[in-house]
Structure formats: C-alpha cells, structure tokens
Amino acid sequence: MKILILCTGNSCRSQMAQGFLQSFDRRLDVYSAGTEPATKINQMAVEVMKKAGVDISHNKPKNADQYLNEEWDYVITVCDHANEVCPVFPGKVRNRLHMGFEDPSEAKGNYTEIINEFYRIRNDIRDEFYSLYESEIKKKIY
C-alpha cells in the first residue's frame, strides 16, 4: 500500500506521520513531502520522535511535485495550508484525506513550553494515524 503525507514544509508534521505509519506496519510504503519544502527537518521533531522510538533523523524535506504522476492508495494532508494548495495529482489517487494538526514549530515560550507542544502534537499525530491505520488502512493491505 502506497501512502503520501503532505504538509507545507515537510519538516515536522508530515515527517512524524510518516515515521509513525511506517512503525505501525512495515508493509506500508509511506512517503512525505511539502508544498513548500523546508531546507531541513525540524530538530525538535527528530527529538520527540526519538523518544517515541521512531528515528526520522535521516529524513530530508521533499517537494510534493516529485510525486505528482505516481499512483497512490492514500494522499493525506496534515495541515490546512497543504490541504488548500494540495496539487492535483494526475496519477490515480484512491483516497484523499485531510487530518489537520497544529504546527508545533509555531509554539512560543521557553524550551520546555515549546518541546511540550511538540510532544502534544506528536501524540495527536500518533493517535490519529493509529486510529486510521486500525480502522481503514489495515483492512486494505494487499
């Protein structure tokens, strides 16, 4: 099963979602990309994912355009901006979903307050994607 997860920068939310989905089931072929990719992955995202036992430290932000002509079982946007500007995929997309999450990189405050926001969003992403995996994706794996 081939899944593409999109956000704006592909530096945080979509990377976390990709990491979690792959950790749920290694049979899944999961990619992530951004509509306006950042230059590097957010290090706080790497840190909170490592605490969850998922290593995303070697991931790099990618542009959604490189995936436009491919076929996908799922294309999932994880931020409102990506949902609004999500490109039309000329390739076949069987299921298009939007699962909006706040951007933890916009958190304000001291280090503890900011990292706690990253943990909160990480947990939301984990829980929502696990629910999607259990209720829908797992049943369709071929």
Question: Which sequence ranges carry the predicted segments?
Answer:
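Cytosolic catalytic domains that perform sulfur/thiol-centered chemistry
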Residues: 1-3, 67-78, 118
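Conserved active-site segments centered on acidic
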Residues: 1-67
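Conserved small-residue
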Residues: 10, 49, 75-76, 125
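Short glycine-/acidic-enriched loop or helix-start segments at secondary-structure transitions
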Residues: 15-17, 42, 85-88, 108
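Residues at the C-termini of beta-strands that transition into short coil/loop
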Residues: 34, 79, 100-102
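Residue-level detector of flexible, active-site-proximal loop/helix-junction positions
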Residues: 37, 82, 103-105
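Phosphate-binding/catalytic loops
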Residues: 86-142
